[in-house]
Design a protein with these regions (language model features):
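Hinge/capping helix and adjacent helix->loop/strand transition within the periplasmic-binding protein
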Residues: 58, 85-92, 105-192, 241-243, ...
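An extracytoplasmic/periplasmic, membrane-proximal ligand-sensing/linker region
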Residues: 32-34, 176-180, 243, 265-326
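N-terminal secretory signal peptides that target proteins for export/translocation
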Residues: 1-7
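N-terminal (or domain-start) structured segment
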Residues: 26-117, 155, 163, 179-206, ...
Length: 326
């Protein structure tokens, strides 16, 4: 082949590469179609409600609709698997929660690896976690409860919505930090565990505040402490576990957004900017507060660190307490 033919062939190859590249939408065009916010739980649940409170505003900031897509099943895993296997282009995002991290901590066979299979975008809200007893419980302070638990091995029971739930791990964290002993009684959901507490069948719960509804205001239940960093604005008379001398007894339910691993950096940045603006919008802040959530934005990097820290902590607790989620 002559020199001219070689040059011509090289140019043809170069043009073919350019044409092929042009067939793929550039990341700078993002977004040019609706973005799906995938929830691994059924419509009408707390995750669904809080995400729907912000998807319209998010769509305005993205310039395309933000569509809530419910894919319930296997405790949120169906939705997580769907997003993990989606094309990493930013159009399918998972609403990730503490529940996904706890599932991985207690289930070594889990089909999704949270740190490896997803790119963090942001955390957007948290839920306060509180320790609650029956309204007429003999335990008037959290110190009373801890002291009794230390002096009477496994005489007290704490309930939860089920093995591996936020309530279960919260209770185990309480045990680990206070060095008191309590027996775990799992139920099939939050409502049965709260009913059991009100009926005196268990001694306490460690649970997300929204699950209690109006039962604290009615006097049926009484909160002894919160696991927040500081006193809750809506319950300034309730002390934190930190105040009581347990600085590591900190925990909150949380929700964030993640994309499939391999999503382009510029797409993640555009999503991050839109989410941050949405979450910080005063109307959205007010709306989520009325739902007993708190605006609690974390950037992608901060969320990544948070996930790894919580996964390490709760994997340790799962191993020590023999928690196996099936």
């Amino acid at each position: 082949m002559g020199r001219g033919a070689i040059v011509q062939a090289s140019w043809l190859a170069f043009l073919a590469i350019l044409l092929a590249a042009g067939a793929v939408p550039a990341a700078t065009d993002f977004p040019n179609k609706p973005v799906n916010l995938v929830i691994g739980f059924a419509a009408g649940g707390e995750t669904d409600i809080v995400v729907r409170a912000m998807n319209e505003e998010l769509g305005k900031r993205l310039g395309v609709p933000a569509v809530v897509l419910n894919k319930p099943g296997s405790g949120g895993l169906v939705g997580a698997e769907f997003v993990a296997k989606s094309k990493p282009d930013g159009y399918n995002l998972l609403v990730l929660s503490l529940s996904h991290v706890l599932r991985q901590a207690g289930d070594p066979t889990m089909t999704v690896n949270v740190p490896k299979d997803f790119e963090p975008i942001c955390r957007f809200v948290t839920q306060p976690i509180v320790l609650v007893v029956q309204g007429d419980s003999q335990f008037k302070t959290v110190e009373n409860l801890i002291d009794f638990g230390k002096q009477n091995v496994n005489k007290l029971n704490f309930g939860s919505p089920g093995v591996g739930s936020v309530g279960h791990f919260s209770g185990e964290l309480f045990k680990a930090e206070t060095k008191a002993t309590f027996k775990h009684v799992p139920f099939n959901g939050s409502a049965p565990s709260i009913t059991a507490l009100m009926g005196g069948h268990i001694d306490f719960l460690v649970t997300a505040l929204p699950a209690l509804g109006g039962k604290v205001a009615s006097g049926d239940l009484r909160i002894l402490a919160s696991f927040a960093d500081k006193r809750l604005s809506e319950m300034k008379d309730v002390p934190t576990m930190i105040e009581k001398g347990f600085p590591q007894a900190r925990m909150a339910g949380w929700f964030g957004f993640v994309a499939p691993a391999g999503t382009p950096k510029d797409v993640l940045e555009k999503l991050g900017q839109a989410f941050q603006g949405t979450i910080k919008d005063p109307k959205i802040v007010e709306t989520v507060q009325k739902m007993a959530f708190n605006e609690a934005y974390l950037s992608a990097g901060e969320l990544s660190t948070h996930i790894k820290s919580e996964l390490a902590l709760f994997s340790k607790i799962a191993k020590e307490e023999g928690i196996v989620i099936k």
